[in-house]
């Protein structure tokens, strides 16, 4: 049976924090809001930004939405390209392609931004499915995004012996929690924006400190399935 692997984008495939944080600061400063310290700003990397503005800046929903739209002005033109692919990601994607995984991106970033970024870094050809957030339709949170991606991939989650065939790779608790809830094997990466403690608390099945360790996990799981 064909296996599925889903990747988060920010903090997993690419290091995008420069463009995101500069665009957050741009939006906050435009409206005269206090800009949080760098440690707090790191918490904006992962969840929907409208939620993050409310949680960490004390905004109402309407204020958070207005600030998010201002964020998009800068991020959509400049910020999305203040970004770089993590080392060895291309090798990992090529390995997954060679081993005939169905490969997907499942990101809380707006889908059109995700596609622009993957095109910019010439990564699009590796992916069978790309699913991101859609603010207008209300597709915002990781579980729903992951559910849609799995449905589009079209593969079973388990084989006839109940062994799981779908992996989710991400750097934040949102990735791990959604993966666990939906029956995927959760791989937390510590080189992104979430801490090891956060990923452990979310019950990540594997923790990887670099991209090569993700490949090692896939090889280990393949050996376990063949036994």
Predicted regions and their residues:
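Asp-based, Mg2+/Mn2+-dependent phosphohydrolase catalytic module
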Residues: 1-2, 117-227
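N-terminal helical cap/lid subdomain that shapes the substrate entry/recognition surface
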Residues: 2-90
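Conserved Rossmann-like nucleotide-cofactor binding loop
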Residues: 12, 19, 111, 174, ...
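Short helix-capping segments at alpha-helix termini
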Residues: 29-34, 60-62, 98-99, 122-126, ...
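Hydrophobic alpha-helical segments typical of transmembrane helices
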Residues: 37-40, 49-52, 113, 145, ...
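Short beta->alpha linker loops
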Residues: 44, 48, 84-88, 109, ...
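Short, acidic loop-to-helix structural element flanking the phosphoryl-transfer center
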Residues: 77-105, 111-115
């Amino acid at each position: 049976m064909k296996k599925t692997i889903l990747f988060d984008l920010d903090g997993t495939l690419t290091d995008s924090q420069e463009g995101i944080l500069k665009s957050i600061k741009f939006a906050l400063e435009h409206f005269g809001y206090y800009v949080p310290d760098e440690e707090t700003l790191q918490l904006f990397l992962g969840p929907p930004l409208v939620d993050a503005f409310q949680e960490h800046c004390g905004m109402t929903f309407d204020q958070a939405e207005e600030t998010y739209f201002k964020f998009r002005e800068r991020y959509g033109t400049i910020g999305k390209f203040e970004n770089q692919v993590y080392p060895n990601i291309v090798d990992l994607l090529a390995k997954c392609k060679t081993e005939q995984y169905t490969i997907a991106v499942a990101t809380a970033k707006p889908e059109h931004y995700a596609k622009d970024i993957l095109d910019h870094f010439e990564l699009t050809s590796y992916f069978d499915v790309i699913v991101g957030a859609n603010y207008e339709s209300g597709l915002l949170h990781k579980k729903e995004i992951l559910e849609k991606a799995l449905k589009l991939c079209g593969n079973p989650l388990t084989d006839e012996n109940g062994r799981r065939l779908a992996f989710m790779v991400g750097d934040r608790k949102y990735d791990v929690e959604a993966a666990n809830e939906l029956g995927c094997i959760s791989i937390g990466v510590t080189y992104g924006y979430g801490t090891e403690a956060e990923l452990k608390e979310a019950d990540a099945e594997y923790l990887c400190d670099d991209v090569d360790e993700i490949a090692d996990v896939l090889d280990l799981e393949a050996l376990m399935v063949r036994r």
